[in-house]
């Protein structure tokens, strides 16, 4: 159900992008772009691994998307505002679901705690990209279309509170990945796109 919700949210945005572009269809954006033309955050292309890693990825992203859609519901762009309002209820459930599992795994057995801690250690360096701004973000902010303020502090409040309840520790390293908004990715995106785009590109 969560995957279907995310497909629906993505489809709404791709349909709007197609309407603005007037040349490319939603399928063109999804299946006919090359790796360097994708600007997704690197955390989304990391392998899901075990259940704890999957839930942690969902938790980080859901916390961000919930705050993002809440803010974008006030966008001057009526379509973005409407899509955001429609998505908030879904993402609120995703956040609640993933948060409960993070706490359950962290505050469970020694093995489950160790596994979720290892997942956190691996994924934490990808979380800084949520809050990077490029020239497009600044232009949208200026025109009242995009975010009017950073969501970083609110996101950290949600995340740190949950990690404390789960009895797992934020890594001490301050290194953060960057570059996805310039089309730079890890080796995993190419593999995902090869599988996802093979049939549409062939036919």
What are these regions (language model features)?
Residues 42-97:
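Internal, conserved structured core segments that host functional sites
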Residues 114-203:
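Extended, helix-rich structural scaffolds rather than catalytic motifs
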Residues 16, 39-42, 67-72, 79, ...:
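Domain-scale activation on soluble regions of proteins
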Residues 79-142:
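A contiguous pocket-lining binding segment that forms or flanks enzyme active sites
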Residues 3, 48-59, 81, 113, ...:
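Amphipathic, non-membrane alpha-helical segments in soluble helical-bundle scaffolds
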Residues 24-38, 160-165:
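Acidic, low-complexity proline/glycine-rich segments
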């Amino acid at each position: 159900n969560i995957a279907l919700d995310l497909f629906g949210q993505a489809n709404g945005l791709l349909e709007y992008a197609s309407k603005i572009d007037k040349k490319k269809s939603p399928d063109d954006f999804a299946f006919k772009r090359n790796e360097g033309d994708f600007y997704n955050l690197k955390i989304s292309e990391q392998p899901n691994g075990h259940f704890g890693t999957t839930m942690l990825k969902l938790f980080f992203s859901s916390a961000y998307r919930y705050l993002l859609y809440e803010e974008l519901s006030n966008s001057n762009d009526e379509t973005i505002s409407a899509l955001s309002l429609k998505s908030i209820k879904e993402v609120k459930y995703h956040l609640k679901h993933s948060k409960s599992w993070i706490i359950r795994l962290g505050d469970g057995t020694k093995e489950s705690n160790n596994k979720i801690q290892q997942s956190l250690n691996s994924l934490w360096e990808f979380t800084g990209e949520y809050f990077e701004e490029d020239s497009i973000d600044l232009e949208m902010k200026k025109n009242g279309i995009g975010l009017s303020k950073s969501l970083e502090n609110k996101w950290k409040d949600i995340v740190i509170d949950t990690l404390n309840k789960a009895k797992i520790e934020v890594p001490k390293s301050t290194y953060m990945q960057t570059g996805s908004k310039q089309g730079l990715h890890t080796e995993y995106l190419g593999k995902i796109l090869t599988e996802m785009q093979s049939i549409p590109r062939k036919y």
